[in-house]
């Protein structure tokens, strides 16, 4: 927050927020590892006196394309290009994960190979997804020098256009599918990760998927699924761009995003 928003806060402000948003009917306690029935009884007793009031009314997010530029005395520019993605409960969430991985999920990804390795236009480039309950984002980050910024952004956009024309190569889809499944399985070997996974799933989706169901969902994603999703997502009229460092003019970025 800012000084202006923090100054008026009192202890009652925080207590009221707790009562409104931290309600027992909205609480999930996830437990993994070695535990007993007595442990579960203790947890239930511990939370039995938790109180809340009212009903959470959360306004659905309304995405608006935007351009954000901030001058900062740093050695490189940081760019984040984002598009509306899919939610945590969308049928397309597995295809979205694979799309993100193919484009910018590591050193063998399209953007890393094209923008960094083959053309040397950036220090780093990768993609990431930000799924929420009712919406989501697919974002592309790159860190680079101001002198290569235009070329890099233009190349990134051309790579997206090419992908929307032809979709993924069979070996790309196969590699990223296996990476996603392997990462999932290895993550569940850690009891802490398993606890977070089941808790988040139950809280946000109201169910915990079996690992076999998740693996099968990845196996059922086709190249056409990813291509159709990419064509829906990479709509330049819906693109948002944030630049921190020594940004160019707004007109320059708007022209590139046309």
Indicate where each model-derived feature is located.
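Charge-rich, well-structured scaffold segments of protease-associated domains
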Residues: 1-54, 87, 117-258
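His/Glu-based metal-binding/catalytic segments typifying zinc-dependent metallopeptidases
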Residues: 55-110, 247
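Short amphipathic alpha-helix segments
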Residues: 110-118
């Amino acid at each position: 927050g800012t000084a202006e928003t923090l100054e008026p806060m009192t202890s009652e402000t925080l207590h009221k927020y707790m009562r409104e948003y931290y309600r027992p009917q909205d609480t999930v306690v996830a437990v993994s590892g070695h535990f007993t029935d007595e442990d579960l009884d203790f947890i239930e007793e511990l939370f039995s006196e938790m109180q809340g009031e009212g009903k959470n009314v959360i306004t659905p997010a309304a995405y608006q394309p935007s351009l954000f530029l901030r001058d900062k005395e740093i050695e490189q520019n940081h760019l984040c290009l984002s598009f509306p993605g899919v939610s945590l409960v969308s049928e397309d969430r597995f295809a979205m994960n694979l799309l993100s991985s193919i484009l910018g999920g590591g050193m063998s990804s399209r953007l890393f190979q094209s923008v960094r390795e083959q053309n040397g236009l950036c220090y780093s480039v990768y993609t990431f997804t930000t799924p929420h309950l009712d919406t989501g984002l697919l974002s592309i980050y790159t860190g680079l020098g101001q002198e290569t910024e235009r070329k890099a952004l233009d190349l990134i956009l051309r790579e997206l256009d090419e992908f929307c024309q032809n979709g993924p190569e069979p070996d790309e889809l196969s590699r990223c599918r296996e990476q996603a499944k392997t990462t999932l399985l290895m993550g569940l070997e850690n009891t802490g990760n398993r606890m977070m996974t089941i808790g988040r799933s139950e809280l946000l989706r109201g169910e915990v998927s079996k690992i076999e169901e998740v693996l099968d969902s990845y196996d059922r994603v086709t190249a056409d699924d990813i291509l159709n999703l990419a064509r829906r997502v990479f709509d330049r009229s819906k693109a948002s761009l944030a630049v921190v460092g020594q940004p160019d003019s707004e007109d320059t970025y708007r022209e590139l995003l046309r």
